[in-house]
């Protein structure tokens, strides 16, 4: 595996770009999708948009330790395929839903299917030589940022040109490609030698003040970053007074956030 680590890194990075683009390309027009396609009233759209947006992260956060444990016991490649297939299915379903309740259920499914990024990282750390691991993870992080930048712009453009439902199908197709690539081109990383761990190591880690403080800082930072995302499109519509191409402008606004993050990283 180590002889082909550059090819594996290239495939993983390309998958990360497609994954991030698929994640973010739907964000700019989700409020309009709820109102125009799913019949949500203007008075209720903020509530529905916030609930639909956040439920995926809630479920994903709860399931992350479980998927991580299964990756150690069942295999990292299997978890990557599971996440990719589940996300692809959820996006295809998102393109055919007709009610906000159905869309909420789709986002719940996305939460259960989360874990693709962590699976990519785990595979990279297992297959890339240790002396090249730092630069390899940096390249993958750059790919993640690139996908976050181009995703909203592509999603807003597709929604403008071909309709909002088309963007769901494109995202589903991208994630299907990722799943197939993992199935046929990424080898299963060798299992690490079992180590005797102390009882309840998570509890011991949380007893360290620096770990607790770091987790709090990360949680607050993520909360601030995600706070405006559910309402940014609605705010753009309010500023433009309903004139102009709201979905495209929202896509540009979200992409600029990614550009700023890349510059300051």
Task: Give, region by region, the residue ranges found by the protein language model.
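Juxtamembrane intracellular "pre-TM" segments in multi-pass secondary transporters
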Residues: 2-5, 187-216
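Pair of pore-lining "gating" transmembrane helices in MFS-fold secondary transporters
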Residues: 4-32, 36, 210-227
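Short amphipathic helix-loop junctions that connect adjacent transmembrane helices
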Residues: 29-46, 231-248
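Central cavity-lining transmembrane alpha-helices of secondary-active solute carriers
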Residues: 51-67, 255-264
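Conserved MFS/SLC helix-loop-helix module at the cytosolic interface between two early adjacent transmembrane helices
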Residues: 62-98
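Paired small-residue
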Residues: 90, 101-109
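Cytoplasmic helix-loop-helix junction between adjacent transmembrane helices
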Residues: 106-144
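C-terminal membrane-cytosol helix-exit motif in multi-pass small-molecule transporters
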Residues: 173-192
